[in-house]
Amino acid sequence: MATLQEEISRRRTFAIISHPDAGKTTLTEKFLLYGGAIAQAGEVKGKRERAAKSDWMEIEKQRGISVTSSVMQFQHGGYCINILDTPGHQDFSEDTYRTLMAADSAVMVIDGAKGVEPQTRKLFKVCALRNIPIFTFINKMDRETRDPLELCEEVERELGIDTYPVNWPIGCGKEFAGVYDRDKRCILHFTDAGHAKKAGITEIELDDPALVDLIGQARRDTLADEVELLGAGRDFDLDAVRHGKLSPVFFGSALTNFGVEPFLNAFLEMTTPPLPRVSDADEVDVYSPEFSAFVFKIQANMNKAHRDRLAFMRICSGKFERDTEYFHVQSGRKMRLSQPQTMMAAEREIVDEAYAGDIIGVFDPGIFSIGDTITMPGKKFRFSGIPTFEPEHFMLVSPKDTMKRKQFVKGVEQIAQEGAIQIFKIPDSGFEDVVVGVVGTLQFDVFEYRMKNEYGVDLRMSGLPYEHLRLIRECPCDVKDLMLCSGSRVLEDFKGRKLIAFGGEWSVGFLTKHNEGLILDDWLSV
């Protein structure tokens, strides 16, 4: 029977990040394929026939994008792997940001034809702030791509991180024949495209005369020159990789499976087991026998068979055991978590135990919030909070059918608690209308879709001119008596805090100037 340290040491918890359409979800599926978690990948059959395994919300399947973070666990090569597949669309960057807080490393997927794109830069910065290992997979080598050396140089120039090509592509597009493994000093020649099944691979030495028969003399000579050029570059430094200073680069095609298995195996060997976490008391040792975790995501109605709400927890230390009594620090309540679950997108499985590095889902009766800490009874430390993004777009929302008010209130309250979409009440107006704030406008579509399909409520939505929010820290009078300028409004969040929405920065100055003693704070962490 494995010890606590052995179980934790074999955990690998990582997020996959990319710009939209770089192939992130396809690569995730192929990891599941090679890990034996699925028998056949769904990507190649098309969205209409079979949606991606990691996309569970109906709107994701219809639009072909990921709008929520999916959690998947599987076993491979002696490792227990937790993949966090994140939304690539910029409108859902907040959910991605929170997910990255739960990851120990990141896989950055880059389109070989396009290079580093805007969303890639944004997500990379979040990873870099935490100094977690970042691995680069340059995808779509089965299509015409830019020069591999140029792509590596762009990653270094645009993102400010050193790179080390672990393998090197042999051709691209229709000529993509395989990769050269620099560590093993051999060619991995791909004999047939895997698509929904595993790709065929033949290993052959660079100086083997038979290589010319496989790839031709010209490509063999070009490869030899490129390998010699790479040898004159920087050396591989595993310590630099694990501290986020050096990004190992791999080339391949997630669609055809070329290069996926070598990448997965090398990544699992190079990346770190679970990392220590910072709390307000001290750094928490992952190998401590005492359980601790934090909530990084809340999701209601993951499918129609489960009309419930799950809180996703990242275990930070020790071992979780089902039916054991734990302590919710924020509420000061003891609780017994009797139905913990691991996930494969929307599919669930009850687990009896889990370890540091694992992600579990627990039923949320309405007490959890993003960033909450769960510990053993008697331990009251808190993990560092998870910031939220300030909304940039606002709408006034009400139910079209006033008879659906109860369903409207339930939907609004549950979606507000998830945190990805900010919802505010208008003081003293009940729930006739609410103000919805989002980072990107596509989130309005998701909100409207969920209210209709999960709660049966059609919405009336109209745009509002607000651009900024400020939290009222101190108010010298009743908020109803504040002197507001045109285009400003007092709102209330679901924690009972009062805020003011503004149409522009000049409005902030007007308010503080004409309301002596009023103190406003910028958008705060959850």
Annotated model-derived regions:
Residues 1-526:
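Structural and coupling elements of P-loop NTPases
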